[in-house]
A protein has these predicted regions:
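N-terminal secretory signal peptides that target proteins for export/translocation
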Residues: 1-6
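Bacterial N-terminal signal peptides
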Residues: 7-21
Length: 259
């Protein structure tokens, strides 16, 4: 039975009040970077109800996801910045023809909620705000493309880690956002989707166009997935234009802007 037919059957059973457990139901192992974490949690229950499949998420910094997959960990779906999907594809880890561009997200400047928000409307204003900060945090440049971009800007501006200005590379999902929320760090630079819903953190603004570095996310099915059709269905499900508002409310731009 094809996926469309299965979805019709599942819908019919649901209307009749019957339990939905398709014979072909599986648990999809979805490995993702931290940026889409809040977004992906929104459609997952509907996908599970509609298809009968279960979704098990693993969220981590993107560099760690790549290393785990290259080391042989098994997954069905991967959602990562497009360049990392490229690398996995070149390594033979991606099922041919299964990748799909999803959306993109930009880098935001964030401070503790209630603290004065610095002007970040121009490159000069951003540099001034960072120069005045006593402490800065941003994503790990060894683990994420966004972190590498910020580290490059700081180096270009000769903003270094000193006793007077501490710089702490730490991913938002591994405690970086909490450093800002707790007041331990003055200012942070993270992908908007990683900090938008974090309690105690306020967005001062996006990096201006001359400094911005958008991260395009893509999804793909792993070459050794035992459930390639349900895996592909999950990617289509989260990439459907009807989900665009879910992506936007969690910090991403519209799906069409990632094309």
């Amino acid at each position: 039975m094809g996926i469309p037919s299965m979805r019709i059957l599942v819908a019919a059973l649901t209307l009749l009040g019957l339990s939905v457990t398709p014979l072909s139901a599986t648990e999809l192992r979805v490995y993702s970077g931290g940026a889409p974490q809040e977004t992906l949690k929104l459609p997952a229950p509907e996908f599970e109800k509609t298809t009968g499949h279960r979704v098990a998420f693993t969220f981590a910094v993107v560099g760690a996801i790549r290393q785990r997959l290259e080391a042989g960990e098994k997954a069905d779906v991967v959602l990562l910045p497009a360049p990392l999907i490229d690398a996995l594809e070149q390594a033979g880890k991606i099922r041919p023809g299964s990748r799909s561009r999803l959306t993109r997200v930009g880098i935001a400047v964030v401070v503790r909620a209630g603290a004065p928000k610095p002007d970040v409307s121009t490159p000069e204003a951003v540099r001034a705000a960072l120069m005045q900060a006593r402490s800065i945090t941003h994503a790990d440049p060894q683990a994420t493309p966004g972190g590498r971009h910020i580290a490059g800007l700081l180096k270009q501006w000769d903003i270094t880690d000193t006793p007077q200005r501490r710089i702490t590379p730490k991913s938002a999902i591994s405690g970086g956002a909490e450093l800002i929320a707790n007041g331990e760090v003055d200012i942070g630079l993270y992908l908007l989707s990683e900090v938008l819903t974090v309690k105690g953190v306020a967005v001062a603004g996006m990096l201006p166009p001359a400094l911005q570095n958008y991260i395009v996310y893509a999804g793909a099915v792993l070459a050794d997935s035992p459930a390639p059709e349900p895996a592909a269905e999950f990617i289509r499900f989260v990439a459907d234009p009807s989900r665009e508002q879910q992506w936007k409310t969690t910090g991403f731009e519209s799906i069409s802007q990632a094309k």
